[in-house]
């Protein structure tokens, strides 16, 4: 019953407001904490490390324009328009989540005894159903073949996510750190099977049935 973001198991909880997330502000996100120390630090870093509070300054302000930069931050400020956009969606959040849950369970029922299987969710956990990810378990097929087939049918599928060790940045890091071998069997297996289907609260039954029927045809 604990609220998501309550930081019961963490010092800071971060939410993404990317356009494909349940609540969006166009881009950006929010960080939650119960720590006054972390909260003050994040507020400082979000605006170039600049302060205007006289009590925290090292110098003597010579006018109301005076400010001091006491840390190296960046411009992480969210605009008022973005905040208003996100705030306007809060009243519909429960509906968003319930619709995603409804559609996810509908998908689950349709994929019994097929060449794919949904990701399992433990009964004591609660998902916001941001993504609907399934696994291709048919040994005669793979997720990339299914991806290409559905993509050609105009269905917005995706592969989430590429293992980070495959990315050039981390490969360079591995060379620099003299890391020659990694145990990546689970990541590689997941990446070879996972496929993300469209999931949105305003999808229609017709859309869902179109997707499922195309998958049936693929495995037939």
What annotation goes with each model-predicted range?
Residues 6, 31, 134-136:
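Conserved hydrophobic "DFG−1" position in protein kinase catalytic cores
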Residues 26-28, 50:
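Acyl-thioester C-C bond-transforming condensing/cleaving domain
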């Amino acid at each position: 019953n604990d609220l998501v973001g309550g930081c019961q198991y963490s010092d800071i909880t971060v939410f993404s407001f990317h356009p494909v997330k349940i609540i969006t502000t166009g881009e950006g996100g929010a960080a939650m904490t119960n720590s006054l120390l972390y909260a003050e630090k994040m507020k400082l870093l979000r605006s170039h490390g600049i302060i205007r509070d006289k009590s925290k300054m090292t110098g003597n302000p010579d006018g109301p324009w005076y400010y001091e930069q006491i840390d190296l931050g960046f411009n992480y400020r969210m605009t008022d328009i973005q905040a208003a956009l996100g705030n306007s969606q809060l009243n519909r959040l429960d509906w968003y989540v319930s619709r995603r849950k409804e559609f996810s369970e509908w998908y689950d029922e349709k994929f019994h005894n097929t060449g794919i299987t949904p990701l399992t969710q433990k009964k004591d956990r609660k998902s916001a159903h941001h993504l609907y990810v399934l696994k291709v378990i048919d040994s005669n097929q793979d997720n990339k073949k299914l991806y290409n087939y559905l993509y050609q049918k105009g269905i917005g599928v995706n592969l989430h996510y590429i293992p980070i060790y495959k990315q050039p940045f981390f490969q360079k890091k591995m060379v620099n750190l003299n890391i020659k071998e990694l145990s990546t069997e689970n990541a590689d297996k997941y990446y070879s099977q996972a496929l993300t289907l469209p999931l949105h609260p305003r999808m229609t039954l017709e859309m869902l049935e179109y997707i499922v029927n195309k998958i049936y045809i693929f495995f037939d």
